[in-house]
């Protein structure tokens, strides 16, 4: 029953309307996605596959989470959804912890991102798995090429790399190095991993993790997108005449009936 309630609360957070939240850009992004048929369809698919928590060995976890299926649905969302809307959900700016927690939960971290253990593994583990993966390796290389500062410089970023940096960062979601927001008090992002247990390879481990946690090019690209988000959403949704909340209430009610 506890897992059902957890899944129900997550569903409300993911698909909830502005009546449950104070106005903020993450709510605006969610409503814009709901008003777009393609975005809403793909979003509903990943929500349905990502409820619950991950379990060891790829087995279905509490609430029905199968991480491989969840991550596949997330890759479809970013590959096939309107980029202006998918990126608005991913990079919406927040000023308070409630907004930041909504943003952190948007892509179902309990299934797609963290665990199944309580302690994150060494970053060398997902990095090595990514380097052996035909799916993950080219995406990570693209992220490094488009988002990493130039060698020997902390601040010199690839020319005109902002939009491409965001695109290739989003391409990592749904891979073995899926990044997410780490908490609800900052905008720090990283894969689910650390470097405390990396032994004599700690420097290599930290270099990988800092691609996310201390990357001025990625931070700058996210901040630039946030400054443009209102006009981006206005352009994307111009002319839409969808009801603001009827889709949300109907979908949420049906899903809750199935869970309870």
From Swiss-Prot:
Lipidation (GPI-anchor amidated threonine): 237
Stored SUPFAM superfamilies: GDNF receptor-like
Tissue spec: Expressed in many tissues including adrenal medulla, brain neurons, with highest levels in the cerebral cortex and hippocampus. Moderate levels found in the gut circular muscle and myenteric ganglia as well as in other peripheral ganglia, including the sensory dorsal root and trigeminal as well as superior cervical and sympathetic chain ganglia. Isoform a1, isoform a2, isoform b1 and isoform b2 are exclusively found in the thyroid, parthyroid and pituitary glands.
Annotated Gene Ontology cellular component terms: extracellular region; plasma membrane; side of membrane
Disulfide bonds: none
InterPro entries in alphabetical order: GDNF/GAS1, GDNF_alpha, GDNF_rcpt
A biological process from GO: cell surface receptor protein tyrosine kinase signaling pathway
Keywords: Cell membrane, Glycoprotein, GPI-anchor, Lipoprotein, Membrane, Receptor, Secreted, Signal
UniProt KW rRNA processing keyword: no
Glycosylation sites: 184
GO molecular function: coreceptor activity; glial cell-derived neurotrophic factor receptor activity
Residue stretch(es) of the prosequence: 238-260
Signal peptide (from-to): 1-23
Similarity comment: family membership: Belongs to the GDNFR family.
Function (record text): Receptor for persephin (PSPN), a growth factor that exhibits neurotrophic activity on mesencephalic dopaminergic and motor neurons. Acts by binding to its coreceptor, GFRA4, leading to autophosphorylation and activation of the RET receptor. May be important in C-cell development and, in the postnatal development of the adrenal medulla.
Subunit structure: Interacts with ARTN ligand and RET: forms a 2:2:2 ternary complex composed of ARTN ligand, GFRA3 and RET receptor. Interacts with SORL1.
PANTHER family in UniProt: GDNF FAMILY RECEPTOR ALPHA-4 (PTHR10269:SF2), GDNF RECEPTOR ALPHA (PTHR10269)
Name recorded for this polypeptide: GDNF family receptor alpha-4
Upper classification of the organism: Eukaryota, Metazoa, Chordata, Craniata, Vertebrata
